[in-house]
């Protein structure tokens, strides 16, 4: 087995978690996140071909390091991921967690689900 980096990048790369599908159902694409500075919440969601070519950023999010954006394929073109919407003073205080469903081919957010995120039911 040969180990290969997802991309040539000096920051951290993150893959999905909790059983998420980092590979599209047709096995043609891989989704991952890039985080330039682990002390900040800014994170980018990227996709590439299965052979690790044709990398492209699909969305900018804010998330912590523990769970990351948990980006996951739903269909060959739809992904779901975690983000935070900022409001409050100067738009810098996190207000609520958001899960977005994005069409990676068009860049359109199809659905936005807002709610309190917690480990408690």
What are these regions (language model features)?
Residues 1-121:
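Sequence signature of WD/YWTD-type beta-propeller architectures
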């Amino acid at each position: 087995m040969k180990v290969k980096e997802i991309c040539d990048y000096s920051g951290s790369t993150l893959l999905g978690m909790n059983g998420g599908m980092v590979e599209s159902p047709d096995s043609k694409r891989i989704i991952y996140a890039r985080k330039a500075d682990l002390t900040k919440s800014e994170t980018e969601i990227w996709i590439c071909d299965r052979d690790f070519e044709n990398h492209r950023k699909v969305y900018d999010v804010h998330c912590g390091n523990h769970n990351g954006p948990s980006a996951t394929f739903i269909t060959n073109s739809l992904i779901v991921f975690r983000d935070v919407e900022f409001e409050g003073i100067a738009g810098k205080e996190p207000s609520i967690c958001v899960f977005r469903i994005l069409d990676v081919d068009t860049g359109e957010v199809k659905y936005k689900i807002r709610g309190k995120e917690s480990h408690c039911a």
